[in-house]
Structure formats: C-alpha cells, structure tokens
C-alpha cells in the first residue's frame, strides 16, 4: 500500500504533469475545441466544468488517447504523447458506466490491467489487495459486480484504475449514475482518496456542486473555450463574465448605470433607480452600463411599511423553506425577480416573510461583483 501512496513522491512538482498546447479538434467540419492551452499540475484535483457540448469530454478523451487532436501537442510528464496510443499513456480512465466485467470477481476485475501488462503473478495479488484496501472493499474481493451497490462498483472501478499506478486518473461524469445521497458520500471519498494517493485527478462534470466541493482548481468551458480558470472560491465569488456567474449556482444580475468615480476602488451607480456605491476598479465613464452581480445568500431583506421607501424595494412573491435556509423571491418595482436565501432561525420572528410583504433589499458593501454590460450568448 505504501508503494502506491507515495507514487508521486519523486515527481517534479515544478513541471506540469500534463500540458495541452494549441489543441484543436473538429468533428464533421465543426470545431469542438479551438486552440486550447492548459497546464495540469502534479497532485491536484482539477475539474473541467461546463454544459453539454462544451468540449469537456473531448478534452478528456484526447488526454486519454481515445481521440486524436487535429492540431497542437499533448505532453504527459514532459513526454510528447500527441500520437501515442491510449494503452501506452500513463493515465487511466474511470467511466460513467464503470465498465466492470460481469463474469469476473472483484479481484479479477482489478487485476485485469496488470495481467494484460504481464506483471508477475507474485506481484499482482499484493497490488490488487492494496488497491482494494484503499477503497475499503478488500472483504469483497471474491464477489461479482452484480452483488455490489452502485457506490461499491464505482470504488472498484477506481481501484482497477489506480492499481496500474497512473500518473493521472481521468474521471468522466463518474458520479452521475448515483443517487443524491450516495453521490454526496462519494464526493468526500474521492477527494480523500486523491489526497491519499497523491495522483493528479482530472474530473469532468456538468454538476457545479460536485466541482465546487471536490476540486483544487476548476476550468469552466463553453463552446470549446476556457472561460475561467481558478480555485472553487474564485470561480464562485469572482466570476469573470456573465456566463460563468450564471452557470455556477444561482445569481442575481442587476442592471446599473455608472454616475461617478468616488475613489480608485469605488463608483457611484444607479441600480433599480436607486443611488448605490459599488466596488469597481476598472475604467468607467459616466452613463456606462454595468451589471451588478449578487448571490442570493449575499442579500439581506428588511420588512418595511407600504408607505416606506428605503433603497431597492419589492414585494415577496414566493418563499420556500429548505430546512437550513428560507429562500424568497422578491419582485422589485421594475418587475425584476430577486432571489434571497437566508439562514432559517425559528426563534427569529422576522425571518419568515409573508407573501405580499414589502421589503428593502440590501447587501454588505464590496460583496457585489461588477461587470461591464454584456449579453449572454
């Protein structure tokens, strides 16, 4: 077990384990990936996130060697593998279907790759059992796949991949077949296993929650292009454009007009007809259209009387109790629907708002993200 755990101990952390340089790929004359450049570091959990058809699985398949790039270069551990067949690359893939052999035992499934590589029999058994111990399934070595739960099958597929000592483990929508509770459990287990092994994981998903909860780093893709590359916190709290902001979780987008610059960090802007101060350090001109982005959990609402005017105001049109939070929809005077998420405190008489209640919407200064006006494509 120690041998696999220290797999990457001698790797050079100064060089990326995978580098994609100028990669492009087309199918039937349609460009899917265009001039993509990406470095993946040793030992990191990288998630490629994006909607269906954005090219994320194509990127994974080109790294694995299942697809050939039309242009560009792919290197793994500083070796050019652009035209190297899949079976000669030091990567393994865990697919959504797991692809376990139904007629083989768990042990034989995990040992299959080693036998294909003609690893000596005396070495196979300890390596297989070490891999099964990592996923806590050594007691099920003699069972068949149909005797296992979905989560157990997924862990066997991972054991079969890591027993080959890959430099990189590729996971293609590997949790999507599991139910919600099991998927949450496997998210934790996958991240723990990745830390234990020290192997680079590249995970492809369209599920934003999976990406945020497991990743060291997230790549957000759209139409074959990387829209943003950053940590989960950077992606969520500081989206670089409207597409990323709307793709990662819920967000409110207020239309705004710049009025004047107050200092190097702040400007005065009109939002929903109300003078407001927002943080924006980019060049701006009077009258310039902007978009002010705020997550539902960043907003606060205060109940006010119908006769009161207090900043941005609206009326509660929907409310949803979700246990830990109370989610409300506020319709402003302009007709905009604003989502607000508040932690539910049963001892607070003001947290459960009545439908039709007039409220004032506020937020902590600097929590907003301000973008130059753009229309989502």
UniProtKB/Swiss-Prot annotation:
Pfam families per UniProt: ABC_tran, TOBE_2
GO molecular function: ABC-type putrescine transporter activity; ATP binding; ATP hydrolysis activity
Domain ABC transporter residue range list: 18-248
A Gene Ontology cellular-component term: ATP-binding cassette (ABC) transporter complex
Binding locations of ATP: 50-57
Membrane association type: Peripheral membrane protein
Coiled coil (residue ranges): none
Source superkingdom: Bacteria
EC number: 7.6.2.11
Signal sequence coordinates: none
Name recorded for this polypeptide: Spermidine/putrescine import ATP-binding protein PotA
Species this protein is from: Vibrio vulnificus (strain YJ016)
Gene name of the record: potA
